[in-house]
Amino acid sequence: MKPVVLFVSLVFSIIGAEPEPDPKELPRIPFTAAKDARKTFTVKEGFELQLAAAEPLVAEPVAMCFDEFGRLFVVEMIGYSERQHEKLGRVRRLVDTNGDGRFDQSTIFAKGLAWPTAVFCSNGGVFVGVTPDLFFFKDTDGDGVADTKKKVFTGFGQARLNVQGIFNSLRWGLDNRIHGATAHSGGSIMKPGTDGKPVSLRGRDFSIDPRTLELRAEGSTAQHGMSFDNFGRKYVCSNSSHLQV
C-alpha cells in the first residue's frame, strides 16, 4: 500500500465567524467532518488514503513541504478569495511527535502574509512565495516560530489580480535547483536593493540555485501546479489543460 497524505479543512475560517449569508445567494454546501472525509474519495486499487492532519491543527492549506526532520510546513491561504483583509495568510509547522503517522503538534511559523501560495524547505529555513516577493524565513531558537525574515526576490506578478495566476509550486529539480511555476501574472524579477538587469518571466517558469540565489527563466509556464517525476520530466497544470508534460 502507498499512503497518501490527506488534509481536511472546513469551509469556515478558524479565526472568526463568517458574515451572515445573503438569502438571495445559492444555499451553502455543508462542510464534511474530518472523520468522514475519506469516504468522499475514490482510491485506486493498491493505494491507501490516510488522514494526517485536520482542523484545528491546520486550515485552508494550499501548499506544503517537508524539511529534513520530517516536519511539515503548510501554507494556509486564510481569507481566499475575498479581499476584506489582505494579510491573513500564514505558514504552519506540523510535527508528528510519536511517529504514528498523524501530526499532533502545530505552530504558527509565520503570519501576516498576503495570499501566500508556495513553500520550500532549504538551508535550515523555509522559502515562502508571497506575491510579489519570495521570502526566506528561519527559526534560530528552536521554538517553532520564524524569527528572521529576508526578502530574497521581488517582482513576481505584481498586479495580484487573479490569485489562481500568481507564482506557486516550488519543487526540487534533478539539477539541484528549486523550480517554480510563474503562472499567468509573469514578472520582472530582481534582488531587493540591487541595480542589476531584471529577469523577465513573461510566459516562462523559473529556477533558483539555493546556494548562490541565482535565478533564471525556464521554458514555458504552468498556471497552478507543477512537479517532476524520477526522470526529471516536468508536469504542469492549467485550467484548460489539466495535465501536461
Region annotations inferred by a language model:
Residues 2-13:
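Bacterial N-terminal signal peptides
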Residues 16-245:
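Beta-propeller domains with acidic blade repeats across secreted/periplasmic ectodomains
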